[in-house]
UniProtKB/Swiss-Prot annotation:
Disruption phenotype: Cells lacking this gene reveal a filamentous phenotype. This is 2-C-methyl-D-erythritol 2,4-cyclodiphosphate synthase. PROSITE patterns: ISPF. GO terms for biological process: isopentenyl diphosphate biosynthetic process, methylerythritol 4-phosphate pathway; terpenoid biosynthetic process; ubiquinone biosynthetic process. Belongs to the IspF family. It catalyses: 4-CDP-2-C-methyl-D-erythritol 2-phosphate = 2-C-methyl-D-erythritol 2,4-cyclic diphosphate + CMP; 4-CDP-2-C-methyl-D-erythritol = 2-C-methyl-D-erythritol 3,4-cyclophosphate + CMP + H(+). It comes from Escherichia coli (strain K12). The record marks H34, T133 as: Transition state stabilizer. 4-CDP-2-C-methyl-D-erythritol 2-phosphate binds at residues 8-10, 34-35, 56-58, 61-65, 100-106, 132-135, 139, 142.
């Protein structure tokens, strides 16, 4: 078994909506990013890549490459997952923590879990997504952006 950890953060800027966990969430602000700014899927992709020792999302999909401008993070996750499977890994489980004062994530979490399970080809019982605030402390508490942490457990397929 191998464990990976991922972290991502994006500042608010421009107009909404935002995309988190693949879900379009109405909000007055957008997130500044080279891709679609999906902090949840970026952190999750990093966790999965880390567990497989395949580097990180920036190595695989560099923000200096115009091909990834405005990229759909679900597509990036699926491509990373294909590479991980090619190394002989299957999924144990993933756990994602979204850190944001606003907007409220709770109503959107069930759909996030559906999308992640679809993209990883796994059962929803293998996907957990939760959200928390920082009680108005720090940059997320001041409403300057959104952060996310994720962990992933991979299992090496037996031959």
């Amino acid at each position: 078994m191998r464990i990976g950890h991922g972290f991502d953060v994006h500042a608010f800027g421009g107009e909404g909506p935002i995309i988190i966990g693949g879900v379009r969430i109405p909000y007055e602000k957008g997130l500044l990013a080279h891709s679609d700014g999906d902090v949840a899927l970026h952190a999750l992709t990093d966790a999965l890549l880390g567990a497989a020792a395949l580097g990180d999302i920036g190595k695989l999909f560099p923000d200096t490459d115009p091909a990834f401008k405005g990229a759909d993070s679900r597509e990036l996750l699926r491509e990373a997952w294909r590479r991980i499977q090619a190394k002989g890994y299957t999924l144990g489980n993933v756990d994602v923590t979204i850190i944001a004062q606003a907007p409220k994530m709770l109503p959107h979490i069930p759909q996030m879990r559906v999308f992640i399970a679809e993209d990883l080809g796994c059962h929803m019982d293998d996907v957990n997504v939760k959200a928390t605030t920082t009680e108005k402390l720090g940059f997320t508490g001041r409403g300057e952006g959104i952060a996310c942490e994720a962990v992933a457990l991979l299992i090496k397929a037996t031959k």
